[in-house]
Design a protein with these regions (language model features):
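Peripheral, non-AAA+ core regions of ATP-driven protein-machinery
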Residues: 2-220
C-alpha cells in the first residue's frame, strides 16, 4: 500500500487486490481517498451492483470489529478504471484502505494483496475464481496473499506466494498491527480423489459466450 501523505486534511491510500476477467486474473489497485466536506461514500472505476453495495458491508464490518468508521468524504477508485469490476472480492481491500487512511492501521505491506467478501459481522466469505487470481499475483510480484479461510487451499496451488487464511476482520487487524500473527496456509496436496471440474459460475461476465457453449454442449 502507498501512503502519499496528507494535504489539507486529505489522505490517499492504495491497496493491492486482484480481479477476474473471464478465466484470467488481473491486478486491481483500490485507491481510497478521504477528504473534508459532507460525509459521503462513493465507489468509482466501473463497479457493478455488487461492488457498489460493498459500501454498506464495509461500513457494518468496520463498526462490528470495534474500529472507527471515518467521518469524511470517501472516494474509492478501482483501477484500472476502464475495466469493469464485478463481484464482492473488493470488500476487504476497501475496508483496509479506509482504516489505513484514517490511521486505524499502520501502512500495509507493499508486496501484499487482499481479497474477500465481508459479512455484516466482519466474517470473511469465500469468493469465486481465487486460483486464477492467485496465479496472477505471482506474475505481478505479489508475495503475500490474504484470502478468506475457505479459499486458502485453492490459493496455495499457485507458486511464489505465501497465502494467509483469514476468518474475520478482527483477526486480520490484529495480524496487521503485529499483535497476533496469522499462520500461513500449508500448500494443499491433492490426495488423488476426483477433483471438481471448472464451473461456469467461476467465470465473471461473458454471459453470451457461456450461453453459446451451453447450447453447443447440449447439441443444439
Amino acid at each position: 500500500a502507498e501512503l502519499p501523505g496528507k494535504g489539507d486534511g486529505a489522505m490517499v491510500v492504495s491497496v493491492r487486490s486482484l480481479g477476474l476477467s473471464g478465466i484470467s486474473g488481473y491486478e486491481v489497485t483500490v485507491e481510497c481517498f478521504l477528504s473534508g466536506g459532507l460525509p459521503a461514500f462513493d465507489v468509482v472505476g466501473l463497479p457493478d451492483t455488487a461492488v457498489r453495495e460493498a459500501r454498506e458491508r464495509v461500513r457494518a464490518a468496520v463498526k462490528t470489529c470495534g474500529a472507527r468508521f471515518p467521518v469524511s468524504r470517501i472516494t474509492v477508485n478501482l483501477a484500472p478504471a476502464n475495466q469493469r469490476k464485478e463481484g464482492t472480492v473488493y470488500d476487504l481491500p476497501i475496508l483496509l484502505g479506509l482504516l489505513t487512511a484514517s490511521e486505524e492501521l499502520p501502512p500495509l505491506p507493499e508486496d501484499a494483496a487482499f481479497l474477500g467478501e465481508l459479512s455484516l459481522t466482519g466474517a470473511l466469505r469465500p469468493v469465486a475464481g481465487v486460483l486464477p487470481m492467485a496465479l496472477c499475483a505471482d506474475r505481478c510480484g505479489i508475495r503475500k496473499l490474504y484470502v478468506p479461510a475457505r479459499n486458502a487451499a485453492e490459493a496455495t496451488l499457485a507458486d511464489g506466494i505465501t497465502v494467509y487464511p483469514v476468518e474475520n476482520v478482527a483477526q486480520l487487524l490484529a495480524h496487521l498491527r503485529g499483535e497476533t500473527p496469522i499462520p500461513p496456509a500449508e500448500r494443499w496436496q491433492p490426495t488423488g480423489e476426483t477433483l471438481p471440474m471448472p464451473d461456469f459460475s467461476e467465470v465473471m461476465g461473458q454471459e453470451n459466450v457461456k450461453r453459446v457453449l451451453e447450447i453447443a454442449a447440449a447439441g443444439g
